[in-house]
Amino acid sequence: MDKVERRLYELYEKAINYEPLSKEEALYILEVDDIYVPFLVHLAQKIKKHYFPENEVEFCSIINAKSGACSEDCKFCAQSKYYKTPINVYNLVPVDEMVEGAIRGVEFGANRYCIVLSGKSATKEEVERITEAVKEIKNEGLPINVCVSAGTLDEESLKKLKEAGVKRINHNLETSRNFFKNIVTTHTWEDRYETIKRIKKVGLSTCSGGIFGMGESNEDRVDMALTYRELEVDSIPLNFLMPIEGTPMENAPGVEVMEALKIIAMFRFTNPKAELRLCGGREQNLRDFHGMATLMTNAMMVGGYLTRAGRDIKKDYQLLKDLKAKRKVSVE
């Protein structure tokens, strides 16, 4: 081993022992020369294997249950009312459409299904309809775990969703506390942070991640990763910006392939016990290196995203076959 490899191995040992990495140590991972990426991926894969010995990959699917007309001004998002983007706008879909979405998820082979709503926070009426849909999915006996992403939900709404059978709530920090003001002005990073704490307080599993390629620095990426370590979230979706025409970020810099692999590895080193999910932008940003990314992660989103199409599901099944990995099938 040379000097860099020895240093990376020392950080690997810290992760294996669940010792927190410092900000400087996490930055070191992001700043190594590209020639060390294969070694870095190897170590990240070993960390994953240590905490997740089963060679499994989970498929998760979503439904865009309420689309557009959002009151918030997130600069990356097609659904904000502030931007003219080519999307469909509609209110919360009926219960049967949410159930049909779960059926489609099962057909794709998804183990998780997330009901996603645009807007700062779901109304009481919307929460009620979601709980009806969740109960119906359970009554149908569909072999899929149900998650919800509906903004800054209060404790009462979270408890209702939990009672209905929801296992996990998604609410993304999106980026670091420091960079957040550059992408959103209609609410604060603290609003999102406190929502995650409420989710944990009521005993629901937490899913919270971010988007890379919005102009944030490596320090911002590390700060977000270390915040998730502090919060001990269960699942971290990793998204790479898909620039959308009409949004302020339609010409954002994006992320290069080697850079993306380093980001994924850094999240594995800093959050070794968390499920890492490859989500939006994985097709465009990982390209021929999808397999390397999957070695470090636990899950991937299939069947498309909120306003954009996803990868051909046949390619994801072939990827699992090539990696000799099993598709996770486990209903909580």
UniProtKB/Swiss-Prot annotation:
The highest taxon in the source lineage is Bacteria
Q: Which GO terms describe its molecular function?
A: 2 iron, 2 sulfur cluster binding; 4 iron, 4 sulfur cluster binding; biotin synthase activity; iron ion binding
Tell me its EC number(s), please. Answer: 2.8.1.6
* Binding, [4Fe-4S] cluster: 70, 74, 77
- Annotated positions binding [2Fe-2S] cluster: 114, 147, 207, 277
Instruction: Say if the entry is tagged with keyword Metal-binding.
Output: yes
GO biological process, any: biotin biosynthetic process
The Radical SAM core domain extends over 52-282
Cofactor requirements of the protein: [4Fe-4S] cluster; [2Fe-2S] cluster
InterPro entries the UniProt entry points to: Aldolase_TIM, BATS_dom, Biotin_synth/BioAB, Biotin_synthase, Elp3/MiaA/NifB-like_rSAM, rSAM
What job does the chain carry out? Answer: Catalyzes the conversion of dethiobiotin (DTB) to biotin by the insertion of a sulfur atom into dethiobiotin via a radical-based mechanism.
Q: What does the similarity note say?
A: Belongs to the radical SAM superfamily. Biotin synthase family.
This chain belongs to the protein called Biotin synthase
> Which lineage ranks, top first, belong to the organism behind this chain?
Bacteria, Pseudomonadati, Aquificota, Aquificia, Aquificales
Gene name tied to this protein: bioB
